Amino acid sequence: MLRNSNMRWRLPLICFVWEIAMIVLFGIFVRYNDEADPHWPIFMKHENITSDIENDFYFRYPSFQDVHVMIFVGFGFLMTFLQRYGFGSVAFNFLLAAFGIQWALLMQGWFHTFVNGKILIGVESLINADFCVGSVCIAFGGVLGKVSPVQIMLMTLFQVTLFAVNEWILLNKLHVIDAGGSMTIHTFGAYFGLTVAWILSRPKLKQNNDKEGSTYISDLFSMIGTLFLWMYWPSFNSAISYHGDAQHRAAINTYCSLAACVLTTVAISSVVNKKGKLEMVHIQNATLAGGVAVGTAAEMMLTPYGSLIVGFICGIVSTLGFTYLSPILSNKLRLHDTCGIHNLHAIPGLIGGIVGAVTAACATEGVYTAEGLKKMFHFEGEYADRTPSIQGIYQAAGIGVSLAFGIVGGTVVGCILKLPIWGDPSDENCFDDDVYWELREEDEEEHLGAANQYITHLPENFKLPDRTEISFK
């Protein structure tokens, strides 16, 4: 079927209209909170604050910087493994994130910081908006190279909306703890993206798989994203934790889990290869699974050795998923997952939710102290009578709610994106920048003769049979 992928009017129209809408909505609703407002000195006196250094900006901004780098650099470069889709990977991630944070500030603001008809925003609002966009970046990985910029913008609009609703239900109604977003960010985002990818499945795509491979250089660029994500993940999981021991604990637990995950990923990658060699796709992705899985329990008394166990397990599970599960999903369920988000985010996200539920249910005053238990799980107000075992049940329920929002929401949005009016690429043009980007003549020649190609991100039966070794002079 012929597809009109020309974006000359569609993309400018949607960008202009939506940005104008953002300007209008921000003008009507959004204002600075007390700590960003010129009335801060008055607020200081009212709250008996003695120094400007107690402004939340100085406490949260370092974490915000780290999270911001993860969203725009980490996720963007992680997806550059596709040999002919580097521009789209980084720049479309940039586009969806830039739009998504604006819409997230509004959606999350209406649910959480809506006071007297206005949304009050501060540095913590910026962190939460980045978290919301993180779930969209995850979902984008499932459809990478197969959708148009307009479809990406539409997906961002709907997913941010669903994320805000799901987050509000989990945090405000179920009263769950999910500091690092194993449920709200990773489980929801991954299953939303996987469902959209399944709805948009292309049965003939495997016949045009030569563009889906990676090269030595593209894999190196992807490793840049991996390293940024890996280094800053402790900040991600602790960014919105309460001041003091909870935030300190979250960073330590994430640090330990990530470290353990690297070793088991390397070990299993070597074991499953007949020649004992390492697969770069495993090192790029599975090494991060420990950060995903420790997210929900990051603030809890998981203990350092418990964090190592979580990372140990996730390195194994994620690597085996890339090796054995991805081909099954592709061949049996027609679920083409470009970046392997099922193995990096979905399964580790579920593991993280389960770890959080069990850790919460096992909490005792002997471990936390009575005051610490109350502070950790916010057992106050209408939740003052909640016990750790009941909290564990609600934590488990949060997994189900996130799954439901991801799958049902992804189904609806996938059906909308499947309409033949959004300028998506044809099968033969998937995973190719040439469809939506103006490339120089020498760039196109490099694309046509990509040297040293070795396809690591595809199931075995998708790989090209005749790979020729090319030595560089």
From Swiss-Prot:
Extracellular side: 31-61, 108-125, 172-179, 241-251, 307, 365-396
Keyword Hydrolase: no
UniProt name for this protein: Ammonium transporter Rh type C
Keywords: Ammonia transport, Cell membrane, Glycoprotein, Membrane, Transmembrane, Transmembrane helix, Transport
GO molecular function: ammonium channel activity
Residues exposed to the Cytoplasmic side: 1-9, 83-86, 146-151, 201-219, 273-285, 329-343, 418-473
Entry's Gene Ontology cellular component terms: apical plasma membrane; basolateral plasma membrane; plasma membrane
InterPro entries from the UniProt entry: Ammonium/urea_transptr, NH4_transpt_AmtB-like_dom, RhesusRHD
Membrane topology category: Multi-pass membrane protein
Major localisation: membrane
